[in-house]
Amino acid sequence: MKTQAKVVVIGGGVVGASVLYHLTKLGCRDVIMLERSELTSGSTWHAAGGMHTINGDPNVAKLQQYTIKLYKEIEDLSGQDITMHMTGGVMLAATEERFDWLKGVYAKGKYLGMDDLEIITPERAHELLPLIDPDQFVGAMYDPIEGHVDPYGVTHAYAKSARKNGAEYYTHTKVESLSQETDGTWNVETNKGTIKAEHIVNAAGLWAREVGRMVGLELPVLAMEHMYLLTEDMPEVAEANAKTGSEVIHAVDFDGEIYVRQERGGMLMGTYEKACVPWSERETPWEFGHQLLEPDIDRIAPSLEVGFRHFPAFERAGIKQIINGPFTFAPDGNPLVGPVKGMTNYWSACAVMAGFSQGGGVGLALANWIVNGDPGFDVWAMDISRFGDYTNMAYTNARVRENYSRRFSIRYPNEELEAGRPLLTTSIYDRQKAAGAQFGASYGLEVPLWYAPEGVKDEFSWRRSTDFDHIGIEAKAVRDSVGLGDISGFAKYSVSGAGAHAWLDRMLACNVPAVGRMTLAPMLKDDGKIIGDFTLASLSDDDFLIIGSGIAESYHMRWFLSHLPNDGSVTVTSHNLELVGLTLAGPKARDVLQACTFDDVSHAAMPFMAVRRMDIGMVPAIVGRVSYTGDLGYEIWVKPEYLSNLFDQFMLAGADHEIRLFGARALNALRLEKNFGSWGREYRPIYGAVETGLDRFVAYDKDADFIGKAGAIAERESGGKLRLCSFVVDAKDADVIGDEPISNAGKVVGWVTSGGFAHASGVSMAQGYVPKELADKSDGWQIELLNEQLDARLQREPLFDANAGRMRS
């Protein structure tokens, strides 16, 4: 066994083998994979092996497309048969609500290049899949790029291909401990000796928690029991094979919470049952391997009952075997991929429950990241940094149970899931709740979404719902008088030290503002793409406050920490809920603030983008003259023990102005009519500054060689490929939410990033990306919503305060 390697991959399942192979594709030869038993031990060997391209996140869908296209390559290179069955598949809808969801998936596929997707009738679905009862369904979607593979064959094809490219892998080699030297290298202690490595990849599957704990890391991963049954040979299968000349196609029956495919002369039926059960909640036994769990048919009986009704032939079939095996899940069901914050060269490739759809993409992204410093794709939906320190074992358990039980359930755009909540709250939570706040969870924190009158609550729908009118009241209150919003969920970072100014000048693409001033601050990757957008406030020569997206706190903190100088001249602190805040916004915002402080907050004394410390009554605060509403407004930041007092002061001082609380949904409506983008929607690491419109905040000519400068200049010279545009949409009873296709002259040319109803302006709006050549085209635009083409109008100027006069007043 080798005693030194550039990368050691821990875990010999499909994901670890894919990572190993992709490292060799990038020229790495000094790489090793370690497996405690045999390849595929754990979850891989008993998987159903299904593969499909459809995913709720379009960027993950692209990686799934890549995975499926990769199979021929590794089969040819390795000589290992992977037994691919490209049968095609149907997604079945038994209700109109589910059919609406399928129409959205179909629309998303159009801009992803999935041109072969079809929305079909139940009768057509029956022609493709004779085993269904078409009377049980209202519609379906057909995808020809769907099927299944042999888990053993795929894993060995990856491993053999990697070995042909120069890698090594060792079975029956158990990792017993990990330790890191001061120079950053790792000691990998195994039952066969020690290996020195530059990088560690945790692809340990069922043992991901154990490998994490070796370095003091508690990964948010939980294994769930998952069952599928295999039938005896069925005459209906033989008849369907003869009739169609091919295997029975795959099917997902969402309302039955089941999936089916052919297995030899019979069928396989798997369930995601409501009465789900975790497996080995605290730790995974090291001796577990090629073993199965005791099946519990009573637990899946409700799903089977629906399945037998929807697929009548199953009721007549004999059950040959019930497979019950554990699979790992993260709290939201997506993988945990990427570098771990605060650790040097420790990488995660865990919780990949759809390994035969996603394994290739995960391996590609992680190999790119290790070798090139960037995944090469937008992998936010899989990035381990999307979770914070709040994801302990109890939280993970609650969320994974919920996610598993809802895997085939509809998630409506206005639906907030309940598991693991409430967890983090501010001191004004009870006040907000008493005022009718309907909460959502953002990065673990309870955030008011909207305020409901007594007796009114969210009714989940693809269309405008019970919140619509009340969000409008909140938004109009901001525009007409004054509103008070909770911004405690924003991310807050302090940057201090003798080297803080110079460090920020390199980290951020903007000019560092003078003391007492703020600026909008794009942050770029090495290639010039956007990796963050912030507000930067200069409190003194060596003390700065950065405000950013709350959901990206770990993501951005990881970037900050990885770029800190080693001399101790810069300190970066993430405040989380140690600094909380409120925003006052609207034409009367200044009057309310002035009534609460002896400081002069007039326009002359505190103009737009000014910032300073001041006392608000008895509360010491940092106040910035800025608002995401695009109106006259302020952001007020305080220590958490002062938040209740601050809230009460503003509500009392604002009573004469009919101050109204507003939530995140009203804030979204207000920012849309200002053409403001947001992180995770309009601003993601696949877009450049020119494409996003953030180039106006990039100081291309400043002396500092900021990260991404060369790439940003190159994009400015070329013009990039895309443009972020705003549209007014001729919508009737529903509004876009994101990922709908944008067409011009009847051809799909772009995609929606976000949207909603701009209540104060009285129109439905969308933001999205289109080719730069079309960005000035005024007519011919349409956006697809619920399988209907809606006319849209390019909205170049903001609908509200186009010249920013009120925002700056």
Model region roles, listed by residue range:
Residues 73, 94-165, 170-171, 176-184, ...:
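Flavin (FAD/FMN) cofactor-binding and adjacent substrate-gating region
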Residues 24-44:
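Glycine-rich FAD pyrophosphate-binding loop
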